[in-house]
């Protein structure tokens, strides 16, 4: 009887652990074409249209080398996401804009989404994460 209980326990733990691992994925974001290696890159992930470019789901600040950068987000649940970044050249932790609100620093979004007379739209930047994934954003 003890043997049967132990087998059942180990089987349950194995199934439970496997399903937890199947639902957590890594997202690698490669960004290229930056103007310089100065400052840092602020990379944000969004998982809801209403929070896009307002409140990030997860964020990361990464270094820049040879006008490129890589940000890795681990253990993300399966779902719909969008990514944005700002090249914070002066490291003041915000996107600098001119008098008209036009960005002075590099920025971009997943799917290389661009806005017309305003910021990019979530629907243009969104993608599905159903496994480990690498996306490339070019300036």
Functional labels for PLM-detected ranges:
Residues 1-24:
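Bacterial Sec-dependent N-terminal signal peptides
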Residues 25-33:
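A short, amphipathic beta-strand motif
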Residues 36-51:
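Short, ordered, surface-exposed loop/turn motifs in non-cytosolic proteins
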Residues 62-67, 129:
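Short proline/glycine- and polar residue-rich coil/turn motifs
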Residues 67, 72, 77-80:
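A glycine-anchored, Pro-Gly-centered beta-turn/N-cap motif
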Residues 81-85:
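A short tyrosine-centered beta-strand micro-motif
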Residues 89-95:
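Acidic, glycine-anchored loop motifs typical of Ca2+
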Residues 105-139:
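Extracellular beta-sheet/turn segments enriched in Thr/Pro/Gly and aliphatic residues
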């Amino acid at each position: 009887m003890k043997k049967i209980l132990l087998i059942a326990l180990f089987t349950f733990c194995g199934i439970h652990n496997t399903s937890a691992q199947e639902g957590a994925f890594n997202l690698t974001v490669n960004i290229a074409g930056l103007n310089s290696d100065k400052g840092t890159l602020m990379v944000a992930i969004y998982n809801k249209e209403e929070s896009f470019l307002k409140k990030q789901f997860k964020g990361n600040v990464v270094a820049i080398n040879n006008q490129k950068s890589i940000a890795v987000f681990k253990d993300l649940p399966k779902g719909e996401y969008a990514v944005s970044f700002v090249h914070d050249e002066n490291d003041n932790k915000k996107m600098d804009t001119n008098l008209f609100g036009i960005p002075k620093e590099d920025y971009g979004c997943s799917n290389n989404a661009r806005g017309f007379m305003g910021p990019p739209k979530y629907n243009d930047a969104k993608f599905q994460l159903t496994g480990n994934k690498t996306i490339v954003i070019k300036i």
